[in-house]
Amino acid sequence: MNTQNEYYGSVGLLYTPIKYVSATLTTDLTRSMLDNNFVNGPNPKRMASQSVLAVQYKNSRFTATGSLLGTYITDKVEQGEKPDDKRRLSPAVSLSWRPFSESTLRIRASYKDIFRVPTFTDLYYLRMGNTNLKPEETSQYNVGVTWSSSCGDWLRHFSISADGYYNTVKDKIVALPTMYVWKMMNMGEVDIKGVDVNLSTQFRLPLRMSLLLASTYSFQYAVDVTDPEAKNYKDQIPYTPRHSGTVSVTLENPWVNVSYILTAVGDRYALPQNIDRNRI
């Protein structure tokens, strides 16, 4: 039996030196503890500090934001090995532009440097955990467009968004089956190219009811590029479908809301090589 507790605190400052320009400084502190009833269990404790300095310029048609995230994480364990302390600076930049003042069309672009530390489950879960895991490092580039509108009383809202992205991932954390149990591992280097499309509408119905329709589609080409000589070079990484999507229908009324969600995914592979016997 596992029991995890977390204590969280945050403080932030906002400064607006001139019109359209603002600066923020925030710090989050998290204390996490995992206890279990296993003999000689690690019972890890984690202290995490995340501080963000961000500067933003924003007017009615253009927004630009730059930020720098500083992360420090340290673990302590009662038994066994503990991972090294983690320190990292992660920059990010985002832009959003509305080219026509009379339209809701927006064009956006962003760059993020993402640093993901292994979770307690990744590191310490019985038989599956791996204290030798390295943090997952990602450089993420994104370009997209959004548009929304209202078309009279019967169509309250319609919106569409489309984004294309390219990610380079180092030491991606994945779960892979071994002879008897699953094991958390790093996958060297992974290239990810993808497209996300989202549609949503809301219709007004009689008797104070409304109908919400939404759909999403994702294409993700995520391939292992660690070793050009390996058999799985440029093969799709395990348990990551190239195609996936959802469709949802929701009926809202003053008494009870009813929803139906359909999710579909394409072929995936249980192991790094994309061969028929590994397909699921």
Predicted features and spans:
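Outer-membrane beta-barrel translocator domains and adjoining extracellular loop/strand segments
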Residues: 1, 34-42, 76-83, 119-126, ...
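Structural signature of outer-membrane beta-barrel domains
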Residues: 1, 30-34, 71-75, 112-118, ...
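Face-selective signature of the C-terminal outer-membrane beta-barrel domain
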Residues: 1-91, 161-164, 199-201, 208-216
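Outer-membrane beta-barrel strand-turn architecture
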Residues: 15-21, 56-63, 89, 97-101, ...
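Gram-negative outer-membrane beta-barrel transporters
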Residues: 19, 61, 159-168, 185-273
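Residue-level detector of the transmembrane beta-barrel scaffold of outer-membrane proteins
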Residues: 22-26, 54, 63-67, 92, ...
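Membrane-embedded beta-barrel scaffold of Gram-negative outer-membrane proteins
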Residues: 100, 107-110, 135-193, 198-202
